[in-house]
Every structure is written in structure tokens, then in C-alpha cells.
């Protein structure tokens, strides 16, 4: 099995000057969505272990918890650690008491959300601020216009989008350069390769791959009985190839993402230091062009059965916004 010993290299994310660790850490699971929250002492220890190991690109959101994940990072980054990390958080998803999600990108909300995140994180500036999901009730230009003001005011350094369509990315980028687009990309989720990845590369936008270990493969619709048997075959083939490579299936899947290009930064999440070390070990797994072809033949985009999410969460396929002309006409 590949070990942690390899050094975590640095990479340029996007074209605006942001430099991050080549592998980031998705922090959501420490507070939300995957069972009970990790005890604070353990979570802080994991975050600090990651930073000391060279994984300095930390990803959170105001909806994780909600809010408690940002508070956790704020505690972990005390004692001078803030300057050692690249801190990314997100806004734009709201949650009602009955668990239904809403989406807001109006200027007033953008500003309020940013100020609240700054306070919870205990920082004066957010390195990378994403719109977590697109508000389709108003033109994307309106949201990005307010984010641009926050950049000019020094409250955020760089702007990102999450789960945005190619056309939405283009429209946003025309208002202010987008540094990164966060999207689910893994052996189990490859639909973004058709349109979104080429668009990002054309515009010089960095790609942040969330759930690079196939979160959606092991849960939600893809784990339902009607899809399970088909998807199990895929996993077994990956497992067999991992055995040949003397690594774990997770390391092989993560290595595949790392081999997609120098503009791609995966952000796997974990609550255990042992798993974090194994994820770092994926950086030392080298795949030949022939092995990449073999892996991609195993994981054809149309082979995985089931949607990534249930009907309570939207993706880039639901992110088209009204034209700016319609907003001006109001």
C-alpha cells in the first residue's frame, strides 16, 4: 500500500495566482452528512495533522453543520496556523427547519453570508469564496458583481463556483475572473468531462474535484438495490487493479483524479488520520498511459447506474440563470 511519506506538492489553481496543496481536504464530513459529528478534539487534531503533512487547502461551507464546520476550522487555525493554509468556503445554500434546501445569490445575501463566514472562521479574508449552488432566479452576473466588490474590499481573494454549467461559468467569468470551479469528478462521476472540464481549461479556471472517492457510488441512489449489482462489478474491477498496483482501491481512484492534469485538485474528506495518510499516499501512485486507458475502460461514463443526488439537491444541470437583459428590464 502506498504510504504517506511522499511530499505533497504545490500547484497553481486557476490563472489569478492562487497556489494550493495538490491535494486538499474536504471538511464537510467532520460536522455533517456522514453520521454524528467528529468530536471536536479529534477533528482539530486531524486538521492540524493535515496541515503539518502538507495538505493546506481546506474546504468548508456555511451549510456544513450548518455553520459548525466553519466554527471548527476557526478553532483549528488558531495559534498561527491561518497563514499556513489556503482557506475555501462557500455560500448560497439555505436550509429550512424541515430539511429542504433553498438557493440564494442576491447581493444582500452574498454580503451577509460573507461577513458571517469571516466571523465564524475568525479571519479577515477568505482565500477562495465559492457560490455553492447557483441561484437560478437571478442572472449570474448579479451575484458575481457583488463578489467582485468583496474582492475589491479585501474580504475575499478569489472567486469560485460549484456545480455550475459551462454557460454559467462563461457568463460569470466575463464579469470577474473565476479562479476555480468545484465539481464532482471521479471514476464514478465522469459526465463533467464532456463540457465543463473543457470550458474550465479554455478559460484558465482551476478544477477542484469533490467526492473524488465516489461518495455517490457508495450512497444515495447509486447504492439502491436496482443499481447496486451493476456498480458492484465496477468496484470489483477497480479493486483487482489496485491489488496489482499494491495500493488500495481508494488510492487508485484518487490517483486517477490526480493524473487528470496539473490544473486539477481533488479534495477527499475523512474523519480519520489513518485515512488521511492513505489519501496522501495516492500522490505516489503512478499510472502509465496504458493503465489510465484500462481504468477509463472500466469506468465508462455511462456504466455507473443511478443519479449522484436525490431530488433535494441540484447540480450543474440545473444552474442556468435568466439573461442579464431580463434583470435590467425590471
UniProtKB/Swiss-Prot annotation:
NADP(+) binds at residues 211-221. Pfam families: Aldo_ket_red. The active site is at residue 64. It is an enzyme of class 1 (oxidoreductase). InterPro entries: AKR, Aldo-Keto_reductase, NADP_OxRdtase_dom, NADP_OxRdtase_dom_sf. Belongs to the aldo/keto reductase family. Its EC number is 1.1.1.-. GO terms for molecular function: oxidoreductase activity. Substrate binds at residue 132. The keyword Cytoplasm does not apply. CDD domains: AKR_AKR13D1. It comes from Arabidopsis thaliana (Mouse-ear cress). This is Probable aldo-keto reductase 6. Keywords: NADP, Oxidoreductase. GO terms for cellular component: nucleus.
Amino acid at each position: 500500500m502506498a504510504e504517506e511519506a511522499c511530499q505533497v506538492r504545490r500547484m497553481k489553481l486557476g490563472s489569478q495566482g492562487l497556489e494550493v496543496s495538490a491535494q486538499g481536504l474536504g471538511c464537510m464530513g467532520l460536522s455533517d452528512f456522514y453520521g454524528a459529528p467528529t468530536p471536536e478534539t479529534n477533528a482539530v487534531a486531524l486538521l492540524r495533522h493535515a496541515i503539518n503533512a502538507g495538505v493546506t487547502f481546506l474546504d468548508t461551507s456555511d451549510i456544513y453543520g450548518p455553520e459548525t464546520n466553519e466554527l471548527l476550522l476557526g478553532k483549528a487555525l488558531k495559534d498561527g496556523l491561518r497563514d499556513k493554509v489556503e482557506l475555501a468556503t462557500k455560500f448560497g445554500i439555505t436550509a429550512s427547519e424541515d430539511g429542504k434546501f433553498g438557493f440564494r445569490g442576491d447581493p444582500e445575501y452574498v454580503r451577509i453570508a460573507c461577513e458571517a463566514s469571516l466571523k465564524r472562521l475568525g479571519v479577515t479574508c477568505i482565500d477562495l469564496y465559492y457560490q455553492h449552488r447557483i441561484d437560478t432566479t437571478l442572472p449570474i452576473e448579479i451575484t458575481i458583481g457583488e463578489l467582485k466588490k468583496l474582492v475589491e474590499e479585501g474580504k475575499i481573494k478569489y472567486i469560485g463556483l460549484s456545480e455550475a454549467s459551462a454557460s454559467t461559468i462563461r457568463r460569470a467569468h466575463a464579469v470577474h475572473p473565476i479562479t476555480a470551479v468545484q465539481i464532482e469528478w471521479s471514476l464514478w462521476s465522469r459526465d463533467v468531462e464532456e463540457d465543463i472540464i473543457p470550458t474550465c481549461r479554455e478559460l484558465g479556471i482551476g478544477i477542484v474535484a469533490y467526492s473524488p472517492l465516489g461518495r455517490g457510488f457508495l450512497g444515495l441512489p447509486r447504492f439502491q438495490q436496482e443499481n447496486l449489482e451493476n456498480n458492484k462489478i465496477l468496484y470489483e474491477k477497480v479493486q483487482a487493479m489496485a491489488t496489482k498496483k499494491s495500493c488500495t482501491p481508494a488510492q487508485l481512484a484518487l490517483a486517477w483524479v490526480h493524473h487528470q492534469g496539473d490544473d486539477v485538485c481533488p479534495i477527499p474528506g475523512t474523519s480519520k488520520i489513518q485515512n488521511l495518510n492513505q489519501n496522501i499516499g495516492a500522490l505516489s501512485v503512478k499510472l502509465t498511459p496504458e493503465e489510465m486507458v484500462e481504468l477509463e475502460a472500466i469506468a465508462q461514463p455511462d456504466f455507473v447506474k443511478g443519479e449522484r443526488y436525490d431530488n433535494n439537491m441540484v447540480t450543474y444541470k440545473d444552474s442556468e440563470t435568466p439573461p442579464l437583459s431580463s434583470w435590467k428590464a425590471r
